[in-house]
């Protein structure tokens, strides 16, 4: 637990990427009209949840007026509305909503992280920004020692989780799994990797991701966690 606390402290003080620093601080200063009475977080957003979790949910990056405003991943935006509703439905959260850091939300046997910790312009981090954030992702993966199931939200998170594992010296399967919604693969180190479309407005408004599809992902995660842990044998 102390490892994650120290990691998250370092994350919140990171200034490695000048483009992201400028953007996150500009958004925090200018604000969106509906949030003009908020004091925006305007810094990198750390991971959040149960340090002893068996489920790890990995997203892309904080939203400019979501996590960059509230200081908590997936909090205060429509993507979070979908995610926390699903987590609550399957027993991974104590409530279905996430509005601000002090709203009483607790994750149960679940931890949420991101491939990039600062809100990027147009929701598109640059390749060098992914690389700059990779050490944080690797350290988060190392620190979450009880993880059995990983749900990646979107192709980018799926691919970068595998890259981080490779960088950690873990032997990736061959052929390498390719992202698709609902893909389930047991990796050589006995972690179950599940791919899901990201619950972004673009995906949910167009129907690419529906509520039943989202719920099925976390029903699968819950089912996998109910199975015996082969690593204990």
Q: Across the structure, where does each feature detected by a protein language model lie?
A:
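A polyanion-binding, active-site-adjacent surface
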Residues: 1-177, 181-229
């Amino acid at each position: 637990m102390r490892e994650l606390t120290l990691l998250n402290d370092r994350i919140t003080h990171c200034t490695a990427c000048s483009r992201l620093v400028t953007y996150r601080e500009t958004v925090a200063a200018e604000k969106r009209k509906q949030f003009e009475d908020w004091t925006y977080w305007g810094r990198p957003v750390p991971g959040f949840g149960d340090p002893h979790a068996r489920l790890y949910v990995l997203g892309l990056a904080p939203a400019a007026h979501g996590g960059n405003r509230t200081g908590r991943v997936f909090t205060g935006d429509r993507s979070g509305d979908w995610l926390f509703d699903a987590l609550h439905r399957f027993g991974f959260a104590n409530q279905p909503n996430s509005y601000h850091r002090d709203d009483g939300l607790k994750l149960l046997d679940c931890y949420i992280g991101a491939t990039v910790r600062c809100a990027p312009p147009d929701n598109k981090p640059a390749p060098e920004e992914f690389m700059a954030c990779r050490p944080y992702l690797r350290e988060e993966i190392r620190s979450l020692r009880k993880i059995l199931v990983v749900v990646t939200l979107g192709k980018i998170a799926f691919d970068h989780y595998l890259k981080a594992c490779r960088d950690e010296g873990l032997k990736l399967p061959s052929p390498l799994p390719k992202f698709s919604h609902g893909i389930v693969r047991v990796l050589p180190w006995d972690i179950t990797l599940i791919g899901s479309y990201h619950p972004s407005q673009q995906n949910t408004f167009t129907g690419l991701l529906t509520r039943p599809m989202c719920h099925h992902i976390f029903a699968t995660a819950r089912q996998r966690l109910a199975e015996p842990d082969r690593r204990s044998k």
